[in-house]
Amino acid sequence: MTIRKNYRTIIKCEFNKENMEQIKEQLTDIKSMNMDELTEFIILLGEKKFRAKQIYEWIHVKHVDSFDEMTNISKKFIQVLKDNAMLISLKKEQVQVSKLDGTRKYLFSLDDGNVIESVLMKYKHGNSVCISSQVGCRMGCRFCASTLDGLVRGLRPSEMIDQIYQIGKDIGERISNVVVMGTGEPLDNYDNLLRFIELLTDENGINISQRNLTVSTCGLVPRMRQLADEKLSITLA
């Protein structure tokens, strides 16, 4: 099956630990897709256009962790999705809760075995989540432990936004503010950061205002200028 260039060619093969990474490179990460891309992908898989909206809602409004939870999608097409796509879902490994103010620190594992951290901070005005944007970091800031082992890789948009989804489900409350200030330099993962912002602020999804998003940087000036040209209403810190 040939997919347009910003999709991966789909190849079916048996799943096992040895070829897990190969398989995941062959499957399409649909949680990182915007609505237009998902619609085109679903049509290419032989389904009607309206299915894309249903699936997008399951992913970005109801925050399901598996295709099997999509109860208004036929079992036949669920299998097609499993054969051709992956639904990124972070695994919650540990939660530490501060006795002082109730701040919750999360340790999540990724599909490739790497781990990242996120933090939930509860305020009177709402719930704020601090997310990671990379596994490791190459900026070399002496005060930051994230850079000790260097950069492993940037997070996919799906891995960035699923930190918010998983924390929201864990506490059973809406997340109102997001800070990209965890592990990694967000502007060093620029394209994925922009897609994350698009998904985060989409009115068809979780719909968090750009004004409630803060991106922290150590000061990558060319990227800061590029971000300014995007004319977003986010806060750069």
Protein language model annotation of sequence segments:
Residues 10-127:
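Flexible, acidic/Gly-rich N-terminal and inter-domain linker regions that tether
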Residues 122-159:
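Canonical Radical SAM [4Fe-4S] cluster-binding loop centered on the CxxxCxxC motif
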Residues 147-177:
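Conserved alpha-helical substructure of the radical SAM core
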Residues 168-177, 182-237:
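Conserved AdoMet/S-adenosylmethionine-binding subsite of the radical SAM
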